[in-house]
UniProtKB/Swiss-Prot annotation:
GO terms for cellular component: chloroplast thylakoid membrane; proton-transporting ATP synthase complex. The keyword Thylakoid applies. It comes from Nicotiana tomentosiformis. This is ATP synthase subunit alpha, chloroplastic. Signal peptide: none annotated. The gene is atpA.
Amino acid sequence: MVTIRADEISNIIRERIEQYNREVKVVNTGTVLQVGDGIARIHGLDEVMAGELVEFEEGTIGIALNLESNNVGVVLMGDGLLIQEGSSVKATGRIAQIPVSEAYLGRVINALAKPIDGRGEISASEFRLIESAAPGIISRRSVYEPLQTGLIAIDSMIPIGRGQRELIIGDRQTGKTAVATDTILNQQGQNVICVYVAIGQKASSVAQVVTTLQERGAMEYTIVVAETADSPATLQYLAPYTGAALAEYFMYRERHTLIIYDDPSKQAQAYRQMSLLLRRPPGREAYPGDVFYLHSRLLERAAKLSSSLGEGSMTALPIVETQSGDVSAYIPTNVISITDGQIFLSADLFNSGIRPAINVGISVSRVGSAAQIKAMKQVAGKLKLELAQFAELEAFAQFASDLDKATQNQLARGQRLRELLKQSQSAPLTVEEQIMTIYTGTNGYLDSLEVGQVRKFLVELRTYLKTNKPQFQEIISSTKTFTEEAEALLKEAIQEQTDRFILQEQA
C-alpha cells in the first residue's frame, strides 16, 4: 500500500498555486437582434467604435458602421449564413488591416488579402490599415516624371505623370480595360509595381486580364485584387482600399506604383446597397450623402512623394462606365472633379474602327507637358493642333462641294494622322517608337501613301529603324531629347524605307 506523504501534497499544491495565472479580460459583447442581406443589427456593444471590426460566435467578421442609440448596424464580410438571432458578438478593438509584403507580387487575392489563385498562402510580417490617411501637402511634390502607357494618343496628347490620377471614362465595350492592361504591359522593365483592382466584374473578364498579363510576363510585377459580381457588397466596397494599401506599401518604400480601379461606380453601387440596408437616408440617384467622400479619400491616396520621403509615387487610373455617353451622371461627375484629367473613350469612334477609341478633343490631362520627356514635347505639339484643325475641317467638308487644294491636303494629312493613332490591343509602343511615328506623320512623310498603307508602312519602318539605325533609340533614351543627330538618322531611315516600300508595292 502506497503511503501518502503530507509534505509532498503540500508541495504540489504550492507549485500549482505559484503557476496559476488568471488573466482578467474585459470583452465588449452584444447580441444579434436581426441578420439578413449582409447586415446584422446588434444589441449591446456599447463601447464599439465606428469602423471597428466585430467577431460573431461562428467566426464571421463584420464592420460596425451605424452606431445608433439602441443598436449597432454591422456589415458582414461574408455570407453570414450561420449567424443566428440571439448569438453573441464581441468587439475586437481593431480596425480593418491587411498583411503586406513583396510576396504578393504575381498573385491574385481578394479584398481581405487572402490568395484566391490556388497557389498557397502568402507570408507577410507587416500590416497596413486598409483605410489610411492620404499624404499631406508637405509630403507631396508636383508631378514631373512621365508614366508611359505605350499608346500614342495618350502619351503624346493626354500625358500621364507618376503620381497623377487620370480617369478612363466611356460606355461599356469601348476598350477601357484594354487601355489599362496595355499600360500595365508597358511598365515591363520600368521598375513600376502594378495593382489591378477588379470590383464587381464578371469572373471571366478578370480571368481574361490575368491570362493576358501571365502570357506577356507582366504578372511578375503585378498584384490582382478581385471581388467579382457575386461577392458580398462589403467586400466589393473594401477591395479598392485593399489595393491602395498594397500600392502604398511600395510607394513608401521609394518605389513607383500604378493602381487601376475597375471600376469605382460598382464600388459606389455596393456602398449604396449597404447604406440603404442600414437605413441611411438616400440622396441623388439613391446614393448616400457621403458617396463623394467614398471616392475622394480613395483617390487622394495617389501621390508623388517629396524627396524627404524618398520620391515614391502612386498613379491611379480609375475606370468609370457611362450609360450612353452621359458624363453628367452623379458618379462620373464626382470622379471627374476628383481626378487630374480624363481619357474619354467614344462608342462611335470604336464602332468606326478607330481603336483605341480615344476622343482626343474632349480628353484632357491637367498635368500636361510636365509629364512628358523633352523629345516627346518637341514632336507632339504639332500633332494635337493638326488633329483639332482636321476635326473642324472634316465637319465643314461634309457640306462644301468644291474645296481648294490646301484644304484637300489638310484633310488628307488629318486622315493619315488619325491612322497613325490606331494601335492593336496588347501592343504598346516604346517612347522612341512613338516619337518616330509622330514625326513621320506630322512632317508629311505619309502624305504620298494611301490611307490603307499607313499602318503597314509604320510597322516596317519601326523594324527597319531598330535593326539598321539602333543609334536613334540610344540617343533618345540617353538624352531624352530629339537632337539634330537623331532627326538626321530618322530622316535617312524614312527615306530608305519609303523607297523600299514603293518598290515592294509596285512588285
